[in-house]
């Protein structure tokens, strides 16, 4: 992919010592060169306007949280085999289909009047300097969960405000087995402790 991409791609790697998402994201942030970081997970299929939507939604002093539609196992197999080459919110096999509808005017209304949503680390964007200012992800988060929510708390506490992007930045999440969640309780407690600070 690095050889065919029209934009520079740098693969950041670390040894597989369990689920250490916070640590690898920090390595990627440190290696990044741009002023603005759009963070996605590797199991997403991005709608063609995804990057453009994020750039239009970016504001100084803010970070962006988006969402994703969930694709069933059957539809994922069809996509990966090449049987299906494009996705639509109306297709059978897409859950949370309201998350994959792109209506730019509704995005403005939702941001202005809609509720603040819980962050999804699979679809977020930040100014690099803001991430450095709050010292990036807390690498004490081991295993699945809550590292993204805890980061958002620290960003908010540093007067960097959340902008919820809905009806733009469309992404489809491929089906896969869920990560081991044995560390979830300690991660949740660590997140709750950050709220009290």
Where are these regions (language model features)?
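Glycine-rich, basic loop-to-helix element that forms the pyrophosphate-binding segment
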Residues: 15-32, 49
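The conserved acidic donor/metal-binding loop of glycosyltransferases
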Residues: 41-45
């Amino acid at each position: 992919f690095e050889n065919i991409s029209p934009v520079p791609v740098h693969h950041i790697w670390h040894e597989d010592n369990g689920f250490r998402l916070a640590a690898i994201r920090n390595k990627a942030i440190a290696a990044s060169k741009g002023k603005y970081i759009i963070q996605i997970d590797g199991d997403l299929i991005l709608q063609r306007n995804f990057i453009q939507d994020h750039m239009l939604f970016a504001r100084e002093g803010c970070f962006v949280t988006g969402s994703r539609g969930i694709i069933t196992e059957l539809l994922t197999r069809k996509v990966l085999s090449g049987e299906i080459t494009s996705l639509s919110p109306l297709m059978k096999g897409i859950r949370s289909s309201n998350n994959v509808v792109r209506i730019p005017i509704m995005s403005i209304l939702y941001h202005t009047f809609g509720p603040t949503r819980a962050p999804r680390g699979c679809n977020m964007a930040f100014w690099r300097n803001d991430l450095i200012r709050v010292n990036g992800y807390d690498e004490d988060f081991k295993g699945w969960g809550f590292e993204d929510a805890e980061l958002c708390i620290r960003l908010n506490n540093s007067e960097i405000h959340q902008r919820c992007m809905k009806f733009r930045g469309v992404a489809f999440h491929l089906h896969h087995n869920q990560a081991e969640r044995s560390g979830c309780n300690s991660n949740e407690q660590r997140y709750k402790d950050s709220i009290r600070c």
